[in-house]
Amino acid sequence: MLFARVVLFGCLGLGPVAGLRAAEERPAVARYTTKAAHDRDGIGKIYFGREIAQVMGHQGASWLERPERQTEERTDVLLDALALGPGEVVADIGAGSGYFSWRMAQKVGAQGVVYAVDIQQEMLDLLMSQMRRRQVGEIVRPVLGTVQDPKLPAESVDTILLVDVYHEFDFPYEMAQAMIRALKPGGRLVLVEYRGEDPAVPIKRLHKMTEAQVQRELAVHPVQFEKNIPTLPRQHILIFRKPRE
């Protein structure tokens, strides 16, 4: 949830702080529209009828590491659903504090690689400090991405994981294209998003997505929707796969 301009606790409504934007950001192309009167939790930029949400900044890292997160989100169940194996190459997009990077490193082991991608150097510095302390610094590789490109090697990754981050991309089309280029043939793109269909999920509206909306946005890219794993209490696990040929 941290692939970001600097905005503190955007999804909880705790108030934005002054933001930064990547230097290469270009004016919106035809696929995007804007509106001046927009949701206080959004940036006024519209994609497929959806307003893009504000993003949490590095000041919110402690919230990602809160002790109750596993109970609330059942992150252990998510990791089991991914079924990662030794030696796999995976990417954690919007890695933030490294909550999932560390856990995935334990799954892929010493022969595997975890690319921890974020656009905030401060977050990557914090993340790698924790990875070295947890003795997985040789497995987890920090990558400073941009708002349009995660900077991953082409056709190098088995699984790309995005946990509560896709809805905050300034350039969702460009990011999806770049991530798919980074996937090996047959690789998986996994989007975990709070369920927009469920009003009982206690998250701001713009920080949730329906399965239909995600499928609509990914349908324009060269991936195939595979399944929605309905095992989490609040979130979708949406699996897309890059064709093998």
PLM regions: where:
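Class I SAM-dependent transferase core
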Residues: 25-91
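Conserved class I S-adenosyl-L-methionine
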Residues: 188-215
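A short SAM/SAH-binding and catalytic strip from SAM-dependent methyltransferases
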Residues: 157-173
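Short glycine-dipeptide loop
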Residues: 87, 110-112, 183-189
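Core SAM-dependent methyltransferase catalytic element
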Residues: 226-245
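A short acidic, Gly/Pro-enriched loop at the edge of an enzyme's catalytic core
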Residues: 148-160
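Class I SAM-dependent methyltransferase SAM/SAH-binding core
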Residues: 91-150
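A short glycine-rich, Lys/Arg-flanked "PGG" loop and its adjoining helix->strand segment in the class I
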Residues: 105-106, 173-188
